[in-house]
Each structure stands twice: as C-alpha cells, then as structure tokens.
C-alpha cells in the first residue's frame, strides 16, 4: 500500500511540474502537393499535401513531461495510418506527437506533443518533420466544415500554422475543381479510422427554382450502415471553387433514413438555391462496395429531371508516412588570440552527419591593473599570456588634487569647468549654478480649520512662491439703529487670525401711541422699546373722564368729511351732540390692513373696528329727493393714482333723507396703493334740517348704518336708493353689548367675494342732476370721457368685484342709463385679476401669463376686467333708455373720443405694448396703427355723436370661458424686432372688435374654446350721423418654428375702399363683421360670433411659416454649408480615379453614364416622374474640356415657386447627351460625383407652396464619367464599321460623335452599346485641397450671401470647364521633380456670384509621357494608379509590370506602392479566362448594361514573384579557401488584388466590354 501511495505522489509531482512550452516548431519550410498513395475516389488530389516544418528542443528550456502543440487550421485530417510521430535525433526520440484530426467536428487539426525523458539540461537537438495532411474545403453541412469551406480559394493562398503565439506561414497554389458546378456534386471523405466516411450529395441546379424533388443515396452491402443521427440537410446559393457549399440555409423537407438508405423529399425551393444532404456511414473495409445516388427534381418551368449516379469503392487506400529527421546540436568553445568573441557553425550534412557543431571562439582573458604616480604622463604596460592563461594590462596614471569652487551665473543650467595645473598638480574645478529664485509669500484663506503652507518651486531664473493658507476668521454680528429709513449691512474683514465684524444697521422702530384710561387721577406715560424690526409702544394713561363718551348734534346741518391716510393703525372717532349748530365728524383711518370707520347720526357712541385682509368692495350711489328745486356742485378735480401695491377703496354714500329740503353732496373717490388722497365735500342744502351720513359696504366688514336704513325705509317710493349688499366672510364676529361703546369686530380671510347691485329709480319730473367730473389717470394710461369714468383698479394679490352706477341728467331732459359689470373669479386661483393700461415710449412689458380684456362703451361706462387661465370671466355692458330721453348737448360740439385698444399680453420672451388706435367721431375716419408687424391690434370703439331728439339703445355681451387647467396661453401679442422672429410655439390668438358697441380681445389656446358674441339693438329712433366703423380681422396663428406677423386690415365706414396694412404673409385672416351706417329713423341689429376649437392633444398644424433650407450631400460627405456663396473648395469625397489601357484596345462607351441619386433608390421604386430631366454635355477640344450639367430637384415642377402640389417619392427619368471631340493628345478621366439623401415624407402628407417647415423635398445628384477619346490619327481604322455611331464618328469633319441615351425605370435595361474607339494608355490622379461641401445657389442672395426667402431654388445649373494645355505639346512647361502636371480648374456658375467666387477646386493630372510610350506594345499592360486613400495623398507615377506574351492572360492590377528596389519577375499568373469568356458572351447576348446577376463582379488577380538568393559557403584550410557547399534560397511572394479596373486580353489584344463597364460601375458607386 505504501508503494502505491508513493507512486501516486510521484505521478502527482510529475504532473505538477510539467508545463506548456512554445517555440519548438520554428519554421514552415514548404507545402508540397502529393499525387501518390491515395484512392482514386477519395480526397481531391490537389488538397493532399506534405507539410515540412523545422523544430528544435533545448534542455535548458524544456523538461521531460512538458507539452507543446502545433495547431493547423483548415486541415481535415492526417493522411497516414499512424496515430503519432516521434521527433528523433540520432535515433533517440525526444518528443512524441499524437495526431488529432478535426474532420467534421472541429475546424482545425492539431499535433499534440510531449517531451520524453531523453531530453536533459545539457542536450540540444533540432530537426524537421514531414506531415501528410488533407485540407478541408467542404463536403458536409456541419458547422465546422461550412467554416473551413471559406478558408481558401483557387490560386495562391497563404497557409498558416500556430505554435503558441508563433505563426508559421508559407504559400501554396490551390487548383480549383469547377467541373461539377452545374451538375450533381458527390463527395466521400474517409476518417482516420478508415472504417467510416462522410457521404455528401448536392442536387443539380434548377436556375428557375425547384417545384419538388428527391435526393439521397443507398447501398445493398451488408456492412454498409448509415448513422441517422449525423444527418445534415440544407440549401445553399453559394459554392466555392471546389463546388462545395459555403452556407447552409434550413428549408422545409422530409427525411427518410434507414441503415442502408437516406432520402430527403422537398417542395418549393427558391431560384438560385440547391439542396444537399450528408451523413456519416460505416463502410466495409475488406471488399469493394457500391453506393447509388438518387437525384430527381422538377423545376419551376415544369421540366422533370432524374439523374441517377453510382460510385464504386475498390481496394483499401494507401497513405503516406509521417517522417521526422533530427540531429544533435553541440556547442563548443575555443580560445583564440584576439579581442572579440566570434561564433561559427561547422559544416553539416544532414543525411551523413548526426551532430551539428557550433564553435564559439573566445579571446584570451585579460585583467587590468591601474596605478598612480606623481608626474604628468600616463603609462601603459601589458603582460602577455598563452592560451589557457590570463593576460594583465597595467595602467599608471599621474596623481592630481582638485579644488572645487561654486559660483552663481545668469544661466538656468549648471556648468562645470576644470582647470588643470601641470606644475603644482592642483587642479581647479569651477561649478556654475543658477542664482536662487526669489520667493513671494502670500497669505490667503481656505476652507480648512488649520494653518498650512504650500511651496511652489520654479525652474532656475523663475520665482518661487509660498502660500500660507489660514482658516477663515470668526465673525461677530451686531445690530444697531441708525438715522436712515432703510436697513443696511456693513462687513469689516480683518487680517488672518483676526475677527471679522458684520454690523446690521436698522432704521428706528415705528412707534404706536395708545391712550388708556385708568383709575388714577393723574396722567402718566409708559414707553415699551423692542428690538430691530419691531414696533415700539407708548402707552398714555389718562384719568377716566365720563364726558368724552358722546356729543350731541344740535345743528340742523351736518357735514361728514372722510379722509384716508397712511400712518399708524389707530382709529379715532368723535361725534358732536345734536344740540350743536354745526359739527364735523372727522374719520382718520390708515393701515396696511384696510380699516374703515363710520360716522353715525346717533347720540350713542360706537366704535367699529374692521380687519380685512386684502379685499375690498366699493359701492357708490347718489340719490336726490323729489323736491322741485335744488342744485348740486361736485368736485371739479379728482386725481386718481395707481401703483403696483394693493389699493383699498373708500366708498362714501351721501343720503339726503330730510323731508323738508335737501341738498346734494358730491363725493370723490380716491384709489391709491398707499391710500393717500384727499376728499373734499361741498354740501349745499335748501333747509337747515339736513343730516349727512355715510354708508360703507365693504368686503372687509359687515355693517350698516341704522340711520341710513331708517331714512331709506321712510323715504318716498319714487326716490328710494336700494342698496343690496352681500358679503361672505368665513370668520366674522359681532359682539353686541348693552354698554357703550358698541364694538363690532370682523375678521375675514384673504379671499372673499362681494356682490353689490345698485339701482337708481327716479320718477319725479322736477329733479335735475348734473354731474361733470373730470378725471385724470396719471399711472399707466389715460381715458377721457364725456360721461362718468370709473378708474381701473390695479390689484395683484386680491380679488375684487366692483359695481358702479352713475345717474346723469341734463336740463329739461330725462335720461336713465345703467351699467353693470359682473366679474367672477375662482377663489382658489392665483391672483391674476387685474387691468393694466400703460403708455410708455418703449412699449415694453415684462408681464408673463396675463389675460386682460378691456371694454369701453362710448358715453356710458369704461371698465377693465382681466382673468387668467384659471378664471371664468363674463363682461356685460348694457345701455337702456327710457321712453323719453333727449340728449341735446351731452358733450361739446367738437368731441374727440379715443378708441381704446384691448391689450392682452402674455409673452414668452419679448412683449411690446399696443398703441391705441384713435378715431374721430366727427371725421369718421380711423387711423391705422403704423406698424409693419402687428398682433392683436384691436380698435374697440369709435365714439359717435348723437343729435337731438334721438334715442339709442345698445347692448353688448362678451363671454369668455377658459379652461382652468390649461397652460396660460390666452393672450394677444404684438412685437417688433429686426429679425421678425418669435420664439413662441403653438399659440392661438383671436381678436374681435365691434364698432360703436363693445370691443374686447378674447384669446384661447388649442385647449380652449372661445365664443364671442356681439349684439347691438336699437329702440324706435336711432340716428348715427358720423360713426367711424372699423372692420375687424380675427387672426389665428400657430407656428412650429418661425411665426410671421399678421396685420389687421381695417376699413372705414365713411370711405368705401378698405385700407389694408401691408403684410408679406398672412394666415387665417377672417373678417368678422363690418359695421354700417344707418340714417335717421332706422333700426339696426347686428351680431357676430366667433367659435374656435382646438384639439388639445394634437400637434398644431395651423401655422404660418416659410422655412427653406437647402443642403447638398457630396459623395459620402454631408456637412452644413460653410462659406455660403463663396465656394472655394471641392469636397474630399470625389474619388481618386486612375485607369490604365493599351493601344488597340476596345473602349466601350457604356462607360459614359449619368446617374441621378447615386443610390439609385428612385429607379428601384419603379415609378417615374416627368418633371425631372438631367443632361450632360462634354466637349473635348485640344485645350479644354467643357460640360454643362443641369438637374431639377425631384418632385418639382416649373411653377413659380418651384414646388409641386404634393410630396412624391418619385423615380427619375434621365436623358443624357455626350459630345466628344477627339484630339491627338494623351487624355484624362474626369470624375465628378454629387449625391444626396432621398426626400422625406412629412407627417401632414402634403407640402404647401411655401414648403411648410420642411426642407426641399429632394436634392439632385449627378455623376459624370467622361474619358477623353484620344490618340486617333488619319491612318487609324475603326472596328465595327457597321456601327452607325462609328460611321458618324468617322465621317464627321470635326471628329465629333454624339451619344444620347434615355432611361426610364431601371437604368441598366436601356443602356446601349456604342462602338469602340481607339485610345492610348494614360493615367490620371487627383489632389484635392479641402473637404468642404458645396452649397446650391439661389436666384437672389442677401448681404450675407445666403439665399433670400423669395429665391427660386427649384433648379440649379452647373458648368464644368477644364482649362489646360495640350499634354503632348506643351507639357514641358509644367514639369517638376515628380512628373508632368497640367492644372484643371472646375468652375461652377450660378446667378448672384461673381466670377472670382466660382473657382472651387484645382485638380492636378500627372503622368510620365516617356514611361507610357516605352511600355505600350501588344503584349504588355500598364498598371493603373491606385485610388487615393486620404485627401492629399500624392500618388506615385505608374510603374508597369511586364507579363510574358506566353501568359494565360494579360491583366492590369492595382499595385499599392510596391517595393521598387526588388527585381520583380512574374513567376505565374492565374486567371479564369473561361469565366470571363462566359461573362463577355453573356454580355454580348443581352442588350443590357450589366449582364446576368450571377456574374462575379469582383475578379481577383494573383501575382507571384520569385526571388533567388544564392550563397556559396567556403572554408579556409591552410590559408586556401575551399568551397564547401552552395545554398540556394527561393522566395515566393504571392499578392492577390481585387482591381478597380481589369482589362482581360485575348490573343488579338481586344478588351472586354464587361471589364470597362465594370470599371465604370465601381467608380460610380465608390466601391473602392
């Protein structure tokens, strides 16, 4: 047991120490095809070969048990009976290598080797091994075999094996097997075990496709057994040069498999595909056997075919043997006289000698000894020795001492200088170093809490810096009072390690003084001081006095005066007793929180405190009793100011309720943010028994005056002022008390409603009331009216509901008019109800998301009500007249009323104000607003004059509903900017204006629904003598990108022709209503309704846009236009072009083609367009080549705007005309190519006349290939004399031929084949200068050389002019070191450009005239120049490769900069002339431009060069050189190319038309 355990440990130890080594196989010597020892039915003869490789093992690197592997890709198996081979030297095996065949399971075979115990550390052996192998080129549907079937192609291939990371390569020529390409394909491949084989069969092709078929094989031999689990079935449309499939596609089939038969049955198989089946079969090993193959099928054309086939297998096969030859490598060392070591290899003959010796020649070893002495010279002495001893060299040097001095200098480097002293033997060493850098020390604060220092060293002559970083100083903040009225902060920053100070200076606190009664008999004052931002208090304690509670009123006249001032929040009231003759009740109220106080005509003392938070309501009423005579004089001047803060309102109501006499009190209302105004009251009374009281209905308090209520109840029914006040307060508290004073306290929230309706009814005939106030608005706008005017309320943070009612009566006339404005606002919306009117020079408003609607009614009421998107506004203006109303002279004779413009403003970016359009009622002419671009300019009202004895009634209602959850988009905007550009997106504005009734602006977004209704009704007799009427235009504008302005067209009712404001582009201009004039005794009723609905979730498609953008994609480069209109470069995508041709060769003019859209996507679509034409004309003279190309963009017609009615993905019908003029000079090829992307179909499916927001539907592309036909002389003969074109060419006096072609649909279906022309060989190259794109031109260019909006872009004409000199006559003028050049200038011409701007590129064409002349003969072809790989590549001149006349075929190959220093000799050239013949034959039999689809479009050219290196090995014996051996090294270099141009020559020297057409095809599509 212990012995077994020890053996196990030993095996484990051996396993652990073994390793994988590489580099054993170090060279692939040769690959020689084998033609012996094989069965006739087995592997293809050309694919069994012997591979010879060299190997070497070194005992210092490898050890026993180590492994190494040779991997051989694309090798099917080893052609030997053996399972391994040994690497031997002198009959000693140093490694054993096992064969591992890939067969159908792996894509490679391998040789796995293990080092034997014979290799020791002092052993070094080398040798070679010959391995018989078979390559895998197909013959199964397995994954590995399909992969290997693509490894090689016919001709020279590189074969590479791998030893670790080391690649071992050689080249070999593989011969094809194409005889089975169009027949039944059968293959059998034996395995290494020789008892199984892979049996493969592929059906005969059906070019039209298969309808049905049956494919398989069977055998009657008893030892023949099919492995049904190894079956592979597929179809393929690709086969390699050995007729084997290189792809496998699954398809529908049925398998029937037994041990002796395998069949598949199938139905439809598409054209171009062939079915195949294979399986592994167990075969007999001792006797012959037969295999029968079944191949039955019916093609799509209905033809049934059955092709049976039988294979016979005879005697067993004979394989080659793997051989290994090696020898020992011995390294010996010898000592020789000399100073260097040399290595030499002694002569070795592998078949005679078994050891290879490497001799290392080493010199006698030498030792050096150094001594010193006191002197000046150095002495050398050598002690010689014989081989085997050691020589000694003595060096005696003088002894010196040195002194070192260090100094500074102005340089940045260090220098050392030594001065030798040969007298005193004391040397001086001076070291110069740069001056030390100066240092700057700075101190700064940093975020850390500790001090640190940073030092930055600079190079010499620089400045070093030291940064001391200190933590921030602590800060002490103090607050103090100062004398100013505002707060400020002062910061004092000290140096590091100090303390910073922040001093906050606050204004002194306001002081509130309160007087209280107390029980003491003396008065005292108490002062309470608080900190900054607080309120100090002074409390005055007074003794109690009972007589201050009330005051009797004795006088019959009372004047109550009220004023509102902004001071402190205190309320004081005083009342006089009833016994006093005259009393003045003074009410002083001011606070940031609106408060109000009321004077009561009562002996009781009441204190009313009202606390309201930002809400107010105003009600004003006037009533006069029905006595015969009284007069009233109101205030003449009242100034109303408005600011941005909230302004509370004071409402004074004067009630005359004495029954004996009355007087009228005039009340003025002050609107102010600061509530700082003055009111003056003038009261005149007939009797002294007049009492004046005040009624205030406010949204901030809930109170009423009992005296006023009693007066109203006791008054006459004909003179009742009915006041209905409704107020809502969530929290109100009324605390009545029996004791005096009564205290009523009310607290409300910040959002409240107040609805006040006032009605005035007067039935007494003797009452006359005249009111002529003059109001002035000094804030933002100005309004002058002949009647009463209600000021606008600037309100930001509250919701206000106001109602005004004013009674106006002239002498000897009766008139009643009432106006009601009702506004409801959502209680939970953002406070946005406000009305802003302004007048400023700049007309700029920065307000965002506001909606303002202004309503102005002539001679009645003017008010402004605004609502935001979450509001619902209803504005109603009513004017009704009673039975007998006479308005003789309401205003002066010359009345000028200003028409008010409603301004609703929401601006995303820029919003300018609206200017008021004025109209004169006397002249009846409206003045248009002078603006080139206007939005929402709405003349609201033109005032009119009424004559005497006329009656008028008008009713106007405007209803606007807005969605509460929509984005605030209800607005009307005008602006003016230089670019006329708006950044607004998806807006919809509707404007409405009605003359003489109501004007409003109602706007809605796409999610809103707006309805505007205007009704005008008149009573019995309405006279409108001079009324200016304006026609209103509704403007609806939604723009995707650019929005142009719309201008409202106005008309005057007096003047019949309408005046139109100029506008370049208008959209959705809808006249709503044009008012008319009516004469006297006529009745008029007019209504207008606008309904606008927008789909909230749809993309806005109603827009006014003109956007034209043109971009041109050149070649493969697409870039935005740069340097528009100043074209100076040509894009780099123009391919480098080079062609090589021979004399007496046939050039097919199929080479000439014009293609629109290089991708040919339109031709593929199959449709056609009659709108497109393209033409190319090329005129070749002795000194120039000129051509004109013109093309239209697809989908365009010849209309004025160059656009068709709809977008079409159309195809192209092209017509080409080419005119060539011959010269006797060597020519060139000009290749100009343009390409562009295909048109885009837009979502709206239609392109409007202005193209919407889309670019041009399509651009054009033109490709012109125009080789110059040169080299003709009078003695030349023309082939194909029966060609009409050829005769036309010959008979022309100017040697000109015209070729025309017309193509519809597929361009290849109608290309004709003109006759061939004689040319000389020439080459061209091109050097481009930049890679910027080409911009198409328009008819009109602006100052920036950009196309203007009105440009005609539907067609562009390019002119190409090649300017140069004759190559053969004047070429020497352009000679330089690289060759001969002739410059060519491409000129593009278009309207709007100067000639100096038309030069865009310079192309250099170079060639060597002498080189071309010397290489032209009947059996030599000139290589063409390669395509340039980068923009500015310089291309070397053409270097010919001469091919012997006995070659199979001549060729032209692309040689990418070959090594010209070598002697290049063509060893062999293989091409498949049969295939090209088939191509040419197919080409001649078809009147098409390309031939059949199965032709190989990328032929391959293989060039093999052989270099021979001969080396004579000599050896000296006795001073005489003796030749020992001669080494001849043959190096084969194989290069394979896929040329851009291929000229295949037959014995007559003609050139295939297919080759030239293929060459043009490649250049056209840029395949290279």
Curated annotation (Swiss-Prot):
Disulfide bonds join 74-151, 97-113, 206-299, 228-257. Residues 909-918, 956-992, 1046-1062, 1272-1286, 1294-1303 have a biased composition (Polar residues). Residues 547-662, 721-738, 768-793, 801-824, 872-904, 919-945, 993-1002, 1009-1030, 1063-1077 have a biased composition (Low complexity). InterPro entries: Adhesion_dom_sf (IPR008966), Agglutinin-like_ALS_rpt (IPR008440), Agglutinin-like_N (IPR024672), Agglutinin-like_N_N2 (IPR043063), ALS (IPR033504), Fibrogen-bd_dom1 (IPR011252). Residues 1549-1568 form a propeptide. It is found in: Cell membrane; Secreted, Cell wall. One of its GO terms (cellular component) is plasma membrane. A lipid is attached at residue 1548 (GPI-anchor amidated serine). The GPI-anchor is attached to the protein in the endoplasmic reticulum and serves to target the protein to the cell surface. There, the glucosamine-inositol phospholipid moiety is cleaved off and the GPI-modified mannoprotein is covalently attached via its lipidless GPI glycan remnant to the 1,6-beta-glucan of the outer cell wall layer. Its main location: membrane. It comes from the Eukaryota. It is a lipid-anchor; GPI-anchor. One of its GO terms (biological process) is cell adhesion involved in multi-species biofilm formation. The keyword Disulfide bond applies. Keywords: Cell adhesion, Cell membrane, Cell wall, Disulfide bond, Glycoprotein, GPI-anchor, Lipoprotein, Membrane, Repeat, Secreted, Signal, Virulence. Glycans are attached at residues 559, 851, 988, 1188, 1284. Residues 546-662, 721-743, 767-832, 860-1030, 1046-1097, 1194-1220, 1271-1305 are annotated as: Disordered. Residues 1-18 form the signal peptide. ALS repeats lie at residues 403-434, 441-471, 476-507, 512-543. Induction: Highly expressed in biofilms and during candidiasis infection dissemination. Cell surface adhesion protein which mediates both yeast-to-host tissue adherence and yeast aggregation. Plays an important role in the pathogenesis of C.albicans infections. Belongs to the ALS family. Each ALS protein has a similar three-domain structure, including a N-ter domain of 433-436 amino acids that is 55-90 percent identical across the family and which mediates adherence to various materials; a central domain of variable numbers of tandemly repeated copies of a 36 amino acid motif; and a C-ter domain that is relatively variable in length and sequence across the family. ALS7 gene corresponds to a hypermutable contingency locus meaning that the diversity of ALS7 proteins provide C.albicans with a large and flexible repertoire of similar but non-identical surface proteins which may be important not only for adhesion but also for evasion of host defenses. This is Agglutinin-like protein 7.
